[in-house]
Amino acid sequence: MTSFQRGFSAQSCSRALICCSRVIDITTPAGAPNVLIVLIDDMGFGMSSSFGGPINMPTVDRLASGGLRYNQFHTTAVCSPTRVALLSGRNHHVNNMGGITETATAFPGNTGQRPNSVAPLAEMLRLNGYSTGFFGKNHETAAWEVSPSGPTDRWPTRQGFDKFYGFIGGETNQWAPFLYDGTAVVELP
């Protein structure tokens, strides 16, 4: 089977699953765990009290003590590659995120657009009955796709998340943030 045939088959199966999931009510298996992923930019591995660091984070400590501590993950020095690797389970270059989205180029591994052949974790969870949400900074969408007019096919709600509330780019104004609820602009009071 050629790579085209494999890709076409995988894409057809994914579409069939998505269509079936709308007809058949998919629920998580009995006893399935809740999944909460917290990514904090610019904080070193050993900084939080959960990992023996000096920053006291009692809520995170409580969550970590009753769950899984993810401590075997490669992070990069910038956020976009780390985010896309965490949310896909794949190396950042496989995800075409060699740097932050604003510095994307046409070079392989650095286009700033996750290939359709890499399934986002949220989509895998959704197809297994989980409800998914993304809140806060996204910074996984190529800079030329960050606009209320779209395209929005690489935004969180088109990558498996049922709910998104936050900002798409790498930064926003702290006093008058440019926020989205899904793909709709949030009007400031």
Language-model regions, residue ranges each:
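Formylglycine-dependent sulfatase
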Residues: 1-189
